[in-house]
Structures are given as C-alpha cells and as structure tokens.
C-alpha cells in the first residue's frame, strides 16, 4: 500500500490545493508514482475524465502536476451547489441527485464505503497518495460526521501537515488555535505546520516560528512565499474576478454570472501579453469589448434572470447587433437561444420555462440525465468572423443537463454570435490563436503584437516553478521522514 501525507488548512483558501499540487510535482520529480486524493470537494469548477466521470478541477490540476491521467477515484464525492442550501451530489463521477445540505450532512457517513474503496484502489497502484483536506478541520459543528479532514485522516491513518495563510494576517493564532481545538488523538496526527503566502524576509519570522513550535509541540515544516505561478486553482477565484487589467490591444469581457462554473475555460486568453480578460457583473462596466463571453453556470435559468435584471442582457444584445463577437459556453450557450424549458424542475429554480436572449435559433429542454463526456474533432461549418476555425482540431468535454434543438457540431454560429457545449474549447492553442487573429484583423492590429507562447510547455514550466517553490519552502527531509512514519 502507498505511503500517504495529508495537507489540511486552517481555513478555506489557505492554499491547500496549490501546495498539494506542488508536493505531487516534487515527488514525481524525485521518482515516485504519486496520486492526489480529496474525499469530498465542493466546487462548480469540474472536469470530465476519459471514461465520462465528473470530478473537481483541483484534483485534475494535481494529477497533471503528478504527470498522470485524472481519475474520479481522486475525488470520489463532488458537491456542486445549486442553491444556498443544496447541492448536486456526484459520487464516483456520476450524479446521484440534488440534496439539501442538512440531508447530505445526515447521510454523509453513508458515503464512507465509496471514499474508502476509491482511496484503497489508488493506494494499491501508486507509491504515495497526497491527500487534500477541505476548509478547516475544527469546524466544531461538522466534526461528528467528518469524512474529509481528521475523520478521513483517521480512516486512512494519514499524518497531517497544517497550513496557515499569513497573507491575511493572524497566522500564529490560526495555526495554534486549530491545533488546540483538536482532540488529543487528532493532535498527535499533526506532524508539522506550514506558513503559506509569506512576503518578506524569513528571518523576521524566526522568533514567532520558534514560539509557534513550542506552543503547538510540532515543528514548522515550511515557510512558502506568496507564489506567482499561473496555475488553475479553485482558491484563486476571488483574485481572478478582482482583476481589471489595464487596456490592451484586444479586450475580452467575461460575464461574471452569480453561479459561474468552469471559469478556467478562459484562462488561455489571459496568457497573451496584450489581451485584457475582464470579469464583468454590471452593465456599465461592459463598455465596448472586442469579444463578450457568457460562461457556463450551474443554474442557467436563475443566472439568465439575473442577467436580465442587471441590464447586462440588453447591453449584450445591443453589442451583438453592433457586430461585437459574442460567444456562449454551455449554460451561456443555452442563454443565447430563443427558449429554455425545465418541465421536470431539473434546476429547481421554480421556473418551468423562460425566453432566452434570442441571439441564436436554439430551443433547450432540461432533462434528468446528465451529459458528461470528453469530446474532440475538427471544426466544420463555422461561418462568419471565426470561419478560419474550419479544419482545425478542438478537444474538451461536455457537462450539462439540457438538450438543445438545432445545435450542430462543436460550434454553432449565426452572424457574429457563437455557442458551444464544449468546455475547454479554447485550450488548444490553435483555436485561441485563430479567434484572436480574427479579432486583430477586424481591429486592424497585428496578431504578433499580442505576444505568443507554447501553451503546453508553458503549463509544464508553471508546475516546475511551483515544485521549485515547494521544495525550497518545505523542510523536505522532514517531509520524507513523515512519509516514512519516522516522526
């Protein structure tokens, strides 16, 4: 069976996902077959594996860092919020249905067999399993039925590294308080604490680190700097949405829907030096972009209502009539159509039908069975501004409840309005390049002036930079002693 180590955090966004990815990369570089694991993830950002299973993006990133194919066993339970008090529950990559939060809490321990089967299966195939916890391990009201933090650590006998975020302040209280609130049994599982997102001279920290070690009774296993690596990370959502780049040659506006999902679809455009990618949630902030993107969403009808009430729908329709390129992905694609029906209340929005934006001749009906599949092929039949996509390859995945009449192929177009069910459609560099070339031609600017790069090599380099930072920040001899159960 595999060796294991678990990364828990003092709170959400402490940096667990990124550090777990970095540790996966370090172990891979050191010759280990390593796999990530998170028993339960709550996220709207998801991915479809080759066998059609759905899993959280964080474990996909960690698998990529480890150099292996993403596998639903790495995230056996995925919760996708549908409302403030309920989620769609996905077990081993397949939808089990929608469930109120209280019902899931009561039934949580029923999912332990699925969690353990997934973990033990991975542990038989790999040398090391790097486990990520969720939120804080000392949410006292949730500890009784915990299957993702110390509850899981007990089940698989995992040693724990506890991570605190110094960038928000109060890291010593975070770490000591979290250790102090543990039961004696769980406290013994914590083998080290990590100070994450540090800016400045470590020497200034040293007196505090020594006191922290004395109070917690465990060593400081690492001080990791605030990282500037370009890696898709669920914890970066607020930072990403907060960005408002200075004007660039090409301006792309992504509508920030309240229940936006798979925001990583657009990250390829962020990597061009002279492309501005903005997230917009107010009509007055839309301005006059070169391209408007309506992203995927977990609640198409509710977010379409928000789009209408906010005034953004009218602004997008006006921009489309003026020739602006409008592109909808998945739920955004459905919104662009004429009509959406939900007779079975799949979205539980209290609405059985609603008019769409009317920019594409599309009729969508929500059904109980979810489409979840990887897809690839060659564009054909693309008209208008993006006609140069014809003959070029695409790859991605579909994940949606609705079926749309009139939808044809990977990309449906009418004039300057385009839509697709394919998440990751911009990931192929040739696709992103072709779209940007079309926008440059329309605007009479040089595509070369945007700055180009090798996307795959760039991603691998980012994982290596992350590994460099983790290797330098962690006490790696201590980490290996923890893995070997010598601590």
Describe each model-derived feature in a short phrase.
Residues 1-320, 325, 342-345, 368-369, ...:
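Flexible phosphate-sensing "switch/lid" loops adjacent to ATP/NTP-binding sites
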Residues 330:
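Catalytic nucleophile serine of serine hydrolases
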Residues 333-334, 426:
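Short active-site segment of divalent metal-dependent hydrolases/proteases
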Residues 337-391:
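A conserved active-site-flanking secondary-structure segment within enzyme catalytic domains
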